[in-house]
Design a protein with these regions (language model features):
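Formylglycine-dependent sulfatase
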Residues: 18-175
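Bacterial Sec-dependent N-terminal signal peptides
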Residues: 1-22
Protein backbone atom coordinates (compact mmCIF):
# COMPACT_ATOMS: atom_id res chain seq x y z
CA UNK A 1 0.00 0.00 0.00
CA UNK A 2 2.82 2.37 0.82
CA UNK A 3 4.30 1.99 -2.70
CA UNK A 4 0.90 2.56 -4.28
CA UNK A 5 0.42 5.76 -2.26
CA UNK A 6 3.87 7.04 -3.23
CA UNK A 7 3.20 6.29 -6.91
CA UNK A 8 -0.21 8.01 -6.72
CA UNK A 9 1.34 11.07 -5.05
CA UNK A 10 4.01 11.29 -7.73
CA UNK A 11 1.46 10.87 -10.51
CA UNK A 12 -0.85 13.50 -9.03
CA UNK A 13 2.05 15.98 -8.96
CA UNK A 14 2.86 15.18 -12.59
CA UNK A 15 -0.79 15.60 -13.64
CA UNK A 16 -0.98 18.94 -11.79
CA UNK A 17 2.24 20.11 -13.50
CA UNK A 18 0.76 19.17 -16.88
CA UNK A 19 -2.40 21.13 -16.11
CA UNK A 20 -0.39 24.24 -15.20
CA UNK A 21 1.46 24.35 -18.51
CA UNK A 22 0.25 27.36 -20.39
CA UNK A 23 -0.72 26.71 -23.99
CA UNK A 24 0.55 29.58 -26.10
CA UNK A 25 -1.21 30.11 -29.42
CA UNK A 26 0.75 30.32 -32.63
CA UNK A 27 -0.08 33.25 -34.85
CA UNK A 28 0.82 34.65 -38.22
CA UNK A 29 0.49 38.29 -39.19
CA UNK A 30 0.27 38.88 -42.93
CA UNK A 31 0.92 42.41 -44.15
CA UNK A 32 0.88 42.98 -47.90
CA UNK A 33 1.49 46.29 -49.60
CA UNK A 34 -1.22 47.47 -51.96
CA UNK A 35 -3.57 44.58 -51.22
CA UNK A 36 -7.21 45.43 -51.68
CA UNK A 37 -9.86 44.07 -49.35
CA UNK A 38 -11.39 41.83 -52.01
CA UNK A 39 -8.09 40.50 -53.41
CA UNK A 40 -8.06 37.20 -51.50
CA UNK A 41 -10.22 34.15 -51.98
CA UNK A 42 -11.75 34.31 -48.51
CA UNK A 43 -12.74 37.95 -49.07
CA UNK A 44 -14.45 37.23 -52.36
CA UNK A 45 -11.85 37.28 -55.13
CA UNK A 46 -12.60 34.94 -58.00
CA UNK A 47 -9.62 36.14 -60.07
CA UNK A 48 -6.81 35.55 -57.60
CA UNK A 49 -6.52 32.05 -56.14
CA UNK A 50 -5.22 32.03 -52.56
CA UNK A 51 -6.00 28.53 -51.22
CA UNK A 52 -3.33 28.46 -48.51
CA UNK A 53 -4.20 31.89 -47.14
CA UNK A 54 -7.88 30.91 -47.35
CA UNK A 55 -7.13 27.79 -45.27
CA UNK A 56 -5.35 29.89 -42.64
CA UNK A 57 -8.30 32.26 -42.54
CA UNK A 58 -10.69 29.32 -42.26
CA UNK A 59 -8.99 27.95 -39.17
CA UNK A 60 -7.97 31.22 -37.54
CA UNK A 61 -9.06 34.68 -36.54
CA UNK A 62 -9.49 37.40 -39.16
CA UNK A 63 -9.30 41.06 -38.19
CA UNK A 64 -11.41 43.08 -40.62
CA UNK A 65 -11.79 46.28 -38.62
CA UNK A 66 -8.12 47.30 -38.55
CA UNK A 67 -6.89 50.82 -39.18
CA UNK A 68 -3.97 51.45 -41.50
CA UNK A 69 -2.06 54.21 -39.79
CA UNK A 70 -0.19 55.48 -42.86
CA UNK A 71 -0.77 55.64 -46.62
CA UNK A 72 2.69 54.24 -47.43
CA UNK A 73 4.41 50.99 -46.54
CA UNK A 74 7.29 51.68 -44.09
CA UNK A 75 5.28 53.80 -41.63
CA UNK A 76 2.42 51.26 -41.76
CA UNK A 77 4.90 48.53 -40.85
CA UNK A 78 6.38 50.67 -38.08
CA UNK A 79 2.93 51.28 -36.60
CA UNK A 80 1.95 47.61 -36.80
CA UNK A 81 5.20 46.25 -35.43
CA UNK A 82 5.36 48.67 -32.46
CA UNK A 83 1.65 48.95 -31.71
CA UNK A 84 2.02 52.74 -31.69
CA UNK A 85 1.13 55.62 -33.94
CA UNK A 86 4.45 55.90 -35.75
CA UNK A 87 4.18 59.67 -36.10
CA UNK A 88 4.73 59.86 -32.33
CA UNK A 89 8.29 58.61 -32.78
CA UNK A 90 8.99 60.48 -36.03
CA UNK A 91 8.38 57.73 -38.55
CA UNK A 92 5.94 59.39 -40.89
CA UNK A 93 7.32 58.65 -44.34
CA UNK A 94 8.98 55.94 -46.41
CA UNK A 95 12.71 55.52 -46.04
CA UNK A 96 14.93 56.62 -48.86
CA UNK A 97 18.67 56.35 -49.36
CA UNK A 98 20.40 57.90 -46.37
CA UNK A 99 21.86 61.24 -47.39
CA UNK A 100 25.17 62.43 -45.86
CA UNK A 101 23.47 65.27 -43.98
CA UNK A 102 21.16 62.87 -42.10
CA UNK A 103 22.03 61.07 -38.90
CA UNK A 104 22.16 57.32 -39.68
CA UNK A 105 20.32 56.68 -36.39
CA UNK A 106 17.21 58.03 -38.11
CA UNK A 107 17.45 55.82 -41.19
CA UNK A 108 15.25 53.09 -39.75
CA UNK A 109 12.81 52.17 -37.02
CA UNK A 110 14.24 53.90 -33.93
CA UNK A 111 16.18 51.37 -31.85
CA UNK A 112 14.49 52.75 -28.74
CA UNK A 113 11.12 51.43 -29.98
CA UNK A 114 10.25 47.88 -28.92
CA UNK A 115 8.67 45.64 -31.53
CA UNK A 116 6.04 42.97 -31.21
CA UNK A 117 8.88 40.46 -31.67
CA UNK A 118 10.76 41.93 -28.67
CA UNK A 119 7.67 41.60 -26.52
CA UNK A 120 6.87 38.08 -27.73
CA UNK A 121 10.47 36.99 -27.10
CA UNK A 122 10.03 38.07 -23.48
CA UNK A 123 7.09 35.63 -23.33
CA UNK A 124 9.13 32.75 -24.71
CA UNK A 125 8.06 32.91 -28.35
CA UNK A 126 10.37 32.20 -31.27
CA UNK A 127 9.76 34.82 -33.95
CA UNK A 128 10.35 34.82 -37.67
CA UNK A 129 10.02 37.51 -40.31
CA UNK A 130 9.67 36.66 -43.99
CA UNK A 131 9.55 39.16 -46.84
CA UNK A 132 10.01 42.88 -47.14
CA UNK A 133 11.41 44.57 -44.01
CA UNK A 134 11.77 48.23 -45.12
CA UNK A 135 12.43 49.44 -41.56
CA UNK A 136 16.14 50.16 -41.97
CA UNK A 137 19.06 48.65 -43.85
CA UNK A 138 21.86 49.27 -41.34
CA UNK A 139 22.81 46.50 -38.92
CA UNK A 140 21.16 48.07 -35.86
CA UNK A 141 17.82 47.96 -37.71
CA UNK A 142 18.05 44.34 -38.95
CA UNK A 143 15.03 42.23 -37.99
CA UNK A 144 17.36 39.86 -36.13
CA UNK A 145 18.42 42.81 -33.96
CA UNK A 146 14.79 43.82 -33.36
CA UNK A 147 13.47 40.67 -31.67
CA UNK A 148 13.15 38.32 -34.63
CA UNK A 149 15.07 35.06 -34.30
CA UNK A 150 15.00 34.38 -38.01
CA UNK A 151 14.70 36.53 -41.12
CA UNK A 152 14.37 35.56 -44.75
CA UNK A 153 13.69 38.41 -47.11
CA UNK A 154 15.09 41.73 -48.16
CA UNK A 155 15.82 44.83 -46.11
CA UNK A 156 14.90 47.59 -48.56
CA UNK A 157 11.69 48.94 -49.95
CA UNK A 158 10.52 49.02 -53.53
CA UNK A 159 12.39 47.19 -56.23
CA UNK A 160 11.84 45.79 -59.67
CA UNK A 161 11.98 42.14 -60.57
CA UNK A 162 13.82 42.92 -63.80
CA UNK A 163 16.62 45.48 -64.33
CA UNK A 164 15.07 48.87 -65.04
CA UNK A 165 15.87 52.02 -66.88
CA UNK A 166 15.05 55.55 -65.78
CA UNK A 167 15.77 58.54 -68.03
CA UNK A 168 18.24 56.45 -70.03
CA UNK A 169 20.20 55.28 -66.96
CA UNK A 170 20.06 51.59 -66.23
CA UNK A 171 19.90 50.38 -62.66
CA UNK A 172 19.33 47.09 -60.97
CA UNK A 173 17.97 47.22 -57.45
CA UNK A 174 17.99 43.50 -56.90
CA UNK A 175 16.50 41.56 -54.04
Amino acid sequence: IRRVLIILMLLSGWVKAQQNEEIKPNFIIILADDLGYGDLGFTGSTQIKTPHIDALADSGVIFTEAYVSAPVCAPSRAGLITGKNQVNFGYDNNLTTVLPQFNPEYSGLPVSEKTIANRLSELGYINGMIGKWHLGEKEQFYPTNRGFDEFWGYLGGGHNYFPSEYNGAKYDLSL
